[in-house]
Regions:
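Conserved N-terminal substructure of TIR/SEFIR domains
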Residues: 1-59, 78-86, 92-95, 118-136
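Short amphipathic alpha-helical segments
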Residues: 1-3, 108-111
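Active-site-adjacent loop/helix micro-motif of nuclease/hydrolase catalytic cores
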Residues: 65-71
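Glycine-rich, charge-decorated loop segments at or immediately adjacent to ligand/cofactor-binding or catalytic sites
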Residues: 95-108
Length: 136
């Protein structure tokens, strides 16, 4: 299964960890930090990746919620039958910086993974991978 990771550019270090964890269990990950090269048309690359992907992990941080790109990617996934049951919102960071109430209502109705509930980052990343494997 090809997985698109939607995130704010400020969260790239965590994105790399998530991508590595998903690839470790055999999932194919599309990540803008690796796939978009200097000179590439950013919008075209994102559009193509969204069309080719079968699942989306949305890393929800304060910066991601302010990002028009992340909002657009979420709207795309919500409108596509292929992403049904395969849109995974992930709350990242301090709950005081991003209370669940700040997450758009449409994402709150989905099962959300809260990284703050795991003692180790790796445990949360493993949970993301498990949910995706079950949805495959």
């Amino acid at each position: 299964m090809k997985v698109f990771i939607s995130h704010a550019y400020t969260d790239e270090s965590f994105v790399r960890k998530v991508a590595a964890g998903l690839e470790k269990v055999g999932l194919e990950v599309w990540d803008a930090t690796r796939e978009i090269l200097p000179g590439d048309n950013w919008a075209d690359k994102i559009s193509q990746a969204l069309q080719e992907s079968e699942a989306m992990v949305v890393l929800l941080t304060p910066d991601a919620l302010r990002s028009s790109s992340v909002r657009w990617e979420i709207e795309y996934a919500l409108g596509q039958q292929g992403y049904r049951e395969r849109l995974i919102p992930v709350l990242v960071g301090n709950p005081e910086e991003l209370p669940k109430e700040d997450v758009p209502w449409i994402l709150r109705r989905l099962h959300m993974i809260d990284m703050g509930e795991y003692a180790e980052e790796e445990e949360g990343i493993n949970q993301i991978a498990q949910v995706l494997l079950e949805a495959a």
